[in-house]
Design a protein with these regions (language model features):
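Extended, charge-rich alpha-helical segments
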Residues: 62-63
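Flexible, glycine/small-residue-enriched loop-and-beta-strand segment within the central core
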Residues: 66-76, 81-151
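Terminal amphipathic alpha-helical/low-complexity segments used for targeting or macromolecular assembly
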Residues: 1-59, 115-118
């Protein structure tokens, strides 16, 4: 089982895995590109969003700034709206239904860390690089929800 397969299945995985690091870097880069656009640059925003969130519905509007860990592991239905500072840490699948509204400063966070410090603390590989054990829990938000601000 690859580290990505473990991650998406909610099993303990190594987030420093090369493939995951590349995917996360791409998600961060696309988030920044989106954040560097204006509301009026609709076509450019759509192109970036199509690459960042290939599983999004029609008529989605993300105000920006936005922050995605990966992007492709998030599914967003039709007619969704997210206000300023929308953050999605999608180490496990995130499913958002149709017509869901997010107020400012909302975060959807799937990552989990072991509760016991002995298991949670940073570990070191033979080459000296540090990593932590992480796992995730999927999040599903049904249709027609309004998630207010600072949630």
């Amino acid at each position: 089982m690859t580290e990505q397969e473990k991650m998406l299945a909610g099993k303990i995985y190594d987030p420093s895995d090369k493939t995951l690091t590349e995917l996360r870097t791409k998600g961060h880069r696309l988030s920044k590109l989106y954040n560097d656009t204006f509301d009026t640059e609709e076509e450019k925003r759509k192109e970036i969003l199509d690459e960042l969130l290939p599983n999004h519905g029609e008529g989605c509007f993300l105000q920006g700034p936005i922050y995605f860990d990966y992007g492709p592991f998030t599914t967003m239905g039709n007619g969704c709206y997210a206000n300023f500072n929308f953050t999605v840490l999608d180490t496990c699948p995130v499913t958002i239904g149709d017509s869901v509204f997010f107020g400012p400063n909302c975060t959807i966070a799937t990552p989990m860390h072991p509760f016991r410090w002995q298991e949670r603390n940073i570990k070191f590989k033979d080459d000296g690089t540090g990593y932590d054990d992480e796992y995730g829990k999927p999040i599903t938000i049904g249709s027609n929800c309004w998630i207010a601000s600072n949630v």
